[in-house]
Amino acid sequence: MLIQLIEGVYRLLWGDLLTLHLGNVTLSLSFMVILLLTAGGFFTLRTRLLPVRLFRDMLAAVCEKNDKGSGLSSFQTLVVSTATRVGMGNLVGVVAAVSVGGAGAVFWMWVTALLGASTSFVESTLAQKYKQPDHLYGGWRGGPAYYLHTLAERKRGRKLRCSVAACLFAVSGLICWCGISQVVSNSVSEAFQNAFSIPPLVTTLVLTALAAVIVLRKEATVKSLDVIVPIMAGCYFVMTLWIILTHLPQLPGVFVRIFSEALGLRQAVGGGFGAVVMNGIKRGLFSNEAGSGSAPCAAAAAECDDPVKMGLVQALGVLIDTIVICSCTAFVMLLAPESVTSGLQGMNLLQAAMQYHLGSFGVVFIAVTLALFSFSTFIGILYYARCNVAYLFGDSWFWQTAYKVLALVMLVVGGMQAYTVVWDLGDVGIGLMTIFNMLALYPLSGEALTALREYEAKKKLK
């Protein structure tokens, strides 16, 4: 019954809503694809192509130090958001996109990132502007639930104990992160079964036990991610870059395949043109999280002298995630012969490609890399979750711990569930989060744009 409900909501959000007949090409788009493309295009135009104009400012904002000691630094917030993107998004998300949508899905992931960077800027700037003191953990907390609450108070003209839209966003976020917890264990157990022939149940239980030791500690923080994430991402980037450089003669053919399938000029392995577009954008959202309201939960925790700088940091995170690391994963798979990867999906597909490039070491490398990424992902999503738990239940150690236990249970469940069911729950949660987040982004976006103009005016005076 529960699985049927999840699949029903999934079809409502991600199933075909609009079908366009363009000559010999049929393009079927879902509600979420239309929503994200529209929002991304709108905010990209309103910010006047921010990812291009202010790229140097993004790099400068990441390097700023936190001298006050409270809250996170700009770099730490980038690390937290990268922890949830790199691994689940860059490995599992890209694999899922190519498995179902073919090579053309990669192009639409790039489009999602370029448009999503501006969306991420707006939501993260607002999160920083409307952050609140975190009396339980110290520092700051915030995110869409908090600026949705502010918007509701303005419309009502009075103080509110809670906002319906804010509560719905918070609940959707908790559902989504439970789904991601399942994706973590499902992917790791599958990878370890392929690499070491370890039964999924054993891998899942060990992963859950190790995760419990980390996340159930009262003083567990994101400081461990400061070292883990940069090293993991760096090693993965270097390894995949080496594979790409050793296959340079094949690279033009890969680009031809990506663009021809993306634009409907060649039939994709995973289905028609609409399937290519939808899966690329859907997995692009799962990877870079732009517009979903996840990253603002980290952005709000930063100690920052200008909300715009935090918006720039998170916009950069979207570009790093999808344009750089996701592309590396995609090229590794697409540089392998189709005869090697044909008929495979999930981590089986990526491991087969890595085995082709690096032999048995490639299978082990991906399994170990994914396991390490999964720890950082799990810590990252629980960091996101705690501000939403706090909005729903206040400053309560009981409810914070209860959600951590629930997430650990989802790790166990995910290791035993079917691949598609696990993804559907995550897609339902992230879809609902995006809808509720957009309810605030459009009416409040003017404040982020005003802050951007003031930031640029200050730059001219210096």
Protein language model regions, located:
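Flexible loop linkers connecting adjacent transmembrane helices
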Residues: 49-74, 96, 102-105, 118-159, ...
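Membrane-interface loop-to-helix entry segments
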Residues: 35, 39, 43-59, 165, ...
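Alpha-helical membrane segments and immediately flanking helix-loop junctions
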Residues: 68-100, 126-129, 136-151, 164, ...
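Helix-loop-helix module between adjacent transmembrane segments
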Residues: 39-44, 82, 115-140, 149-186, ...
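Extracellular/periplasmic helix-exit of transmembrane alpha-helices
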Residues: 123-135, 241-257, 270-271, 301-304, ...
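N-terminal alpha-helical transmembrane segments of multi-pass membrane transport
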Residues: 1-88, 98-105, 116, 440-462
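Transmembrane helix-loop junctions in multi-pass membrane proteins
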Residues: 46-51, 90-94, 176-189, 211-224, ...
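Selective recognition of specific alpha-helical transmembrane segments in multi-pass small-molecule
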Residues: 115-123, 203-218, 229-249, 282-285, ...
